[in-house]
């Protein structure tokens, strides 16, 4: 059984201690999240942009890229953002056994702990594909899956201006978790247009809250 990325409604019915789809619905709160980094070219530009606008975010990192770019992970933490687990090699999770899936998670757990001395970190599955067996395994271990409630579509072959216009015309609701990616420059181009408007509107750009102990 696989729960597809378009089924946020289904995951949203599960307890938040198992799956986080939205953040606290405080007035103006919007939770930024970025997958697939760190990237040596695009992540620094994105961090510069977030710093200029006093915005915070959660970065769901790939283990192999953590090993390749540790200084970027250190910068993410130093600038007040939070870390999440996005597997070690970003494989097609549904083709792996449960043990192989957990190995991907645990290997990246160990890497992340070296940077922020915390854990276990929230895990966002590659491509958002969640299996029932992984949900059950996480429930037994008291682990937390992080999903999203608003997809920026920044991985689609659309001009950033069009994607930014969509977000302005249909803005995220308070508490929404916005899915973006920092393995390309698209997210930074979108946010360069959105962050000034959101701040003018009184929105607060935040990282996801820490996992409850």
Regions found by a protein language model. Give the residues of each.
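A short acidic, amphipathic alpha-helical/loop segment
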Residues: 45-46, 71-75, 134-137, 190-194
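A cross-domain feature marking catalytic cores of carbohydrate-active enzymes
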Residues: 34-36, 61-63, 85-87, 125-127, ...
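Active-site beta->alpha N-cap acidic-glycine motif
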Residues: 2-96, 100, 104-107, 111-114, ...
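His/Asp/Glu-enriched short active-site or ligand-binding loop at hydrolase and phosphoryl-transfer sites
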Residues: 115, 129-171, 202-213
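Non-membrane alpha-helical structural segments and their capping/turn regions in soluble enzymes
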Residues: 98-103, 161, 185-188
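Active-site environment of divalent metal-dependent phosphoester hydrolases
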Residues: 39-42, 89-92, 129-133, 153, ...
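C-terminal domain-boundary segment and adjacent tail
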Residues: 15-26, 53-54, 67, 186-213
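Divalent metal-coordination and catalytic microenvironments
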Residues: 35, 50, 59, 83, ...
